[in-house]
Amino acid sequence: MLTERKEKIEHFKKEAYYKVSLSDGKLTVTSESIPSEMDAEELRKLCDGTEALVTRVKREQKKTFPPKLYDLTSLQREANRFFGYTAQKTLDMLQELYEEKMVTYPRTDSQYVTEDMKETVKMLAEGMADFLPFLEFGQIMGNINRVVNNAKVSDHHAILPTKEAMEKGMGGLSGGKKNLLMLIGQQLVQATGEEYLYEQTEISVQCKEHEFTAKGKLPVQMGFKEVEEAFRKYCVKDKKSDEPDHKTELPEGYEEGMTLASVKAEKSTHYTSPPKMFTEDTLLAAMETAGNKEFDSETEKKGLGTPATRANIIEKLVASGYAERKGKQILPTVAGCELIHVMPENLKSASLTAEWENQLLMMEKGKIQEDEFMNGIVSLINEILSLCRAIPEEERNRFQTAREVIGKCPVCGSDVYEGKTNYYCSDRSCQFALWKSNRFLESMKKSMDKKMAVELLKKGRTHVKGLYSKKKDSKFDADLVLGLEDGKARFSLEFPKKKK
């Protein structure tokens, strides 16, 4: 997924498109996207200064339902979005909160609670007014039925704050754990809150047989969003909301059949945008739904990984050098891209996961036997090994890191490369090496850097500043001179005469 997204971005070609807007001084209506600049300009000229007719004014009462309670993945996503926490950091802090009896079991894939928990959840929701510093009691509705669904709770219910957390308070918690606990608490209040109600107005205008529209949105009841905004203001002060503005007001007084006299027409240029690089938030979402179209309708476990393993999968990719973090983004490394390039197609597809999840489900229902399942696994492994053996040598060489030659060996004349701890001769039979940490330099509080090594190999000496004299307890400058003894490096100091 990471490499596919990177390739889409790299190969993306920006394309221009155009829109024409009409205005009578109060109301502005806009056309659909127009691919051709010439067509857009013709429409602008055609409509500019002419009359336009209001053909429709549609007003609708709409609602947005409250969000669900958190399972592990949705909480990890929100913690990344609001606070920049990695999925692993969120899981680690949640585990600590769980062990401190401040939250319920974190490794859950359910966003609901069971019928027998209604009274407990009601008590927790009502207690949030005192527990969360940014809430008022009037913001708590306690519509518990919305979060109750026995059929959608398997082993563990949604993540909730505990009664013990409300009794202890958040005073002794670190900033990160406090943020998570407030996030979980406000989600409980949102999930049991009222709907967000708004009036949506759409005005359609016709000019020269072309349609132009404007949409407006006015909140009627903020509902659960009032809690969300209070949380943002208190906990995410320096972060702009990524939610669209609640209010987009259209001017009053426009009705069907009205004529707009002498409208002004303007053309605007827009550009298509490439897909965005994954953040931990969006990657977790993609992992959760990956390959869903390829899964059998009866398959219970879908996506890549489970709520408990997705964070670890991401961390392993980073630790293995196949992915890296840059700010909030997660990017594939060169090694990661090369690996995907040579990997067999079936290993890259979520359909492989789908196939084996279906096999496990069939075994659970007694439709296939364990031996049949294991034979399939062995067969798949043998197939993968055969494919890997068939990878051409030039493709395997993609993973060999190009080594930089920093100089020639003064003993045998072979190339010298940089290693983790030294600069070594490429001839394995030669003992020559310049060690980054050696007793001679360490006694003067210095180590061998690449610049020094290059000059020693080229000139036999390098000027070093800031050497330390223990005897005089002071620093001095000198030339480090390379000598050889039995094919090994030996060092001495020389003090060049100062120019008069």
What is each PLM-predicted segment?
Residues M1-E96, E100-M102:
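Conserved phosphate-chemistry cores used by DNA topoisomerases
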Residues K8-H11, Y17, A87-Q88, D92, ...:
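Basic, low-complexity terminal or inter-domain segments flanking catalytic cores
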Residues V103-D109:
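Short amphipathic alpha-helical interface patches used for protein-protein assembly/oligomerization
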